[in-house]
Amino acid sequence: MAAASTTSRTNSRVNYSNEIHDLSTVQSGSVVPTLFYPDKSIADIFPPHLGKKVISEVVATFLLVFVTCGAASIYGEDNRRISQLGQSVAGGLIVTVMIYATGHISGAHMNPAVTLSFACFRHFPWIQVPFYWAAQFTGAMCAAFVLKAVLHPIAVIGTTTPSGPHWHALLIEIVVTFNMMFVTCAVATDSRAVGELAGLAVGSAVCITSIFAGPVSGGSMNPARTLAPAVASNVFTGLWIYFLGPVIGTLSGAWVYTYIRFEEAPAAKDTQRLSSFKLRRMQSQLAADEFDTV
């Protein structure tokens, strides 16, 4: 029994040591998390588990569109049941939930413009981009047509259309998507950011910006989220805005954060690595296991 216990503690220490090493390496910049694939082998760029990542994106995008378009559909039919603020909160919360649920699997992009931006700035392999786009548009389309069925006889399923001049809506979409991508790059690609709060940060950015963008452009920030309900509702007014705006916004947001980002001195980076909640927890457990063996 004692031997088995010792073996168990030894295996536990080995596992924790490996996790600490991996996390430290990730935060030091040598290896980066799901969203970042620098120069790697074909097996890393085109992994055997790509299918699971694609399914994760389908599910995450489905739920994103189902919640956001569902809330918008009900608001459009009867604004006494769901308010404009309620729509924004629902959108921000579903983004937060999906990041925590699927971020460790696929990166929880849920947005073709985000995937494109990550690929352009070497945070995602180009070879996987078409698969992610297919997953995102598939999930969005499925959600839109499911909503069309369950919300019948509502004819317009959460479409986003300009409420005024098209250039107003375009400018709003660029600005709000810039904000979302700037925050996303900060928490997803920078080792100094508190990664555990990524979901809250990105979800809050989506919620805050959509509160004022909603009355002007609908606050889409996502080509898949706009195209799917447009097809289901047969409403294509200003559709180009919701492709061009998010693409410009995400690319500019990622570029600006990449430009202002800088690397700290090694000593400072070492201190920053120890601020990770997960790393501290692992190190505490490792120390406790070592104490038990003394």
UniProtKB/Swiss-Prot annotation:
InterPro entries, sorted: Aquaporin-like, Aquaporin_transptr, MIP, MIP_CS
Record's GO cellular component terms: membrane
An MF annotation (GO) of this entry: channel activity
Record Pfam families: MIP (PF00230)
Motif (NPA 1) on chain: 111-113
Residue ranges of the TM segments: 54-74, 88-108, 129-151, 169-189, 197-217, 235-255
Membrane topology: Multi-pass membrane protein
Keyword match Repeat: yes
Motif (NPA 2): 222-224
Keywords of the record: Membrane, Repeat, Transmembrane, Transmembrane helix, Transport
Subcellular location: Membrane
Purpose: Aquaporins facilitate the transport of water and small neutral solutes across cell membranes.
Assigned protein family: Belongs to the MIP/aquaporin (TC 1.A.8) family. NIP (TC 1.A.8.12) subfamily.
Domain-related comment: Aquaporins contain two tandem repeats each containing three membrane-spanning domains and a pore-forming loop with the signature motif Asn-Pro-Ala (NPA).
The protein, known as: Aquaporin NIP2-2
Species the sequence originates in: Zea mays
This protein's encoding gene: NIP2-2
